Amino acid sequence: SIAYEQSKLDIEKKHSLSFKNVTIDKAMAQLLKETGYVYKIKGYHIIISLQDIKQKTTSNDTQKLTQTIRGIVVDSKTNTPIEYASVCIIEDPSRGGSTDGRGNFRINNIPVGRYNIQASFMGYRPSIISEVSVTSSKEVFVEIPMDENVQDLAEVLVKPEIKKDRTVNPMAITGGRMISIEEASRFANGFDDPARLSSAFAGVAGDVGTNAVAIRGNAPQFTQWRLEGIEIPNPTHFADLSGLGGGFLSALSTQVIGNSDFYNGAFPAEYSNALSGVFDMHLRNGNNQKYEHAFQVGLMGIDLASEGPINKKRGSSYLINYRFSTTSLASGNDINLKYQDLAFKLNFPTRKAGTFSIWGLGLIDRNKADVLERSEWETMGDRSSGYNKLDKLAGGLAHKYVLDENTYIRSSLSATYSKDRSLADLHTDDAIINVA
């Protein structure tokens, strides 16, 4: 017998077909072909029904921009990778995974936006990295440190916490705060400079024209700058020209700088030669899976960056960034600020010998001011001309070797160079007097 719903089947429409030596399945398939109806056989009955067609909305047809989030989960004290830790996106817990034998994880097809990423593992406190920006232009790499969780057998309490006061340096107990480049980029009028961001903290006073900061009333020139654990000269363009301890623009581009520590109080014993505060900055590692390049043009300069793997199998990578000022192009004359800077980092992890890295930072600053026309002289400054030349270099070779779960050795061989030269002339009606 044949069963159907009369309201959904046009019984007035007739079909004439001829079959010979065919099965009932082939006959019904030919009969209902392109009619919008389907059938199914139950026992001795054939049931005919209207085909269920699901309409796709326009929003589902729209292809969303997605990107990949990669990273590593490590122990905050020993920096050793944590295997098989669970990683997920808090806004969508279904998107996530677990780390491999080297602590690496990968989450694919994440729509662009900002996300909070959580890592959890037995014996550790859940760790959350907040406000991770995902863009379509490049992969996101996140390092998630986790603290061991001491458990009482009578009671177990696991509580996720977002610790803004946790520093990159595990030896810092108090007086420090981690500054992420994400925070610096969102700070109004901050020029992506961690020093300008720090002026918003308690006990820190900033300057409008420079990135000089006075910490707890101490002079800005007593602030110590560190890069990859090595003390370096102030990595700021035109430093100390308008005021001691400050400069115009950070020489470290947002393309290369990673999470850094800022100390405005008591700091660990490893930081010496500092009376005010400490900026302990770090260069991030390049992408060891794919090549990525960036080109930025702004009012202050041109920024070129490139990163990618050196050897994918061994996990080695490179990262390089170069900036060149465009103020001379914008002004069209010789009274301007000219600067260049170059930063790079090469990372070479090994299975038995530890991790080797080579890094460097260099900056060149030039500033020339010509004297005004004689008819425009009103003050001593109008009669003056000057030329400033600043060159700074810093670089090193670093090695990190993990002895066991609680101990690792980090050693560095580095060199720094700094040279400042200033010339000033005073023009009179009869002569030019060199005053500096």
Where are these regions (language model features)?
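Outer-membrane beta-barrel translocator domains and adjoining extracellular loop/strand segments
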Residues: 330-335, 363, 368-377, 413-416, ...
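Short, acidic Ser/Thr/Gly-rich low-complexity loop/linker segments typical of extracellular
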Residues: 92-104
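Extracellular loop and loop/strand-boundary signature of outer-membrane beta-barrel proteins
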Residues: 290-292, 330-334, 378-385, 394-398, ...
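Transmembrane beta-barrel wall of Gram-negative outer-membrane proteins
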Residues: 298-324, 334-367, 386-415
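N-terminal export/assembly leaders
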Residues: 1-59, 95-98
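Periplasmic N-terminal accessory/gating domains of Gram-negative outer-membrane beta-barrel systems
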Residues: 125, 131-143, 157-267, 278-284
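Short strand-turn segments of transmembrane beta-barrel domains in outer membranes
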Residues: 246-250, 258-268, 277-308, 320-337
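Short, acidic, small-residue-rich periplasmic hinge/interaction motif at the N-terminus
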Residues: 35, 41-90, 120-125, 135-187, ...
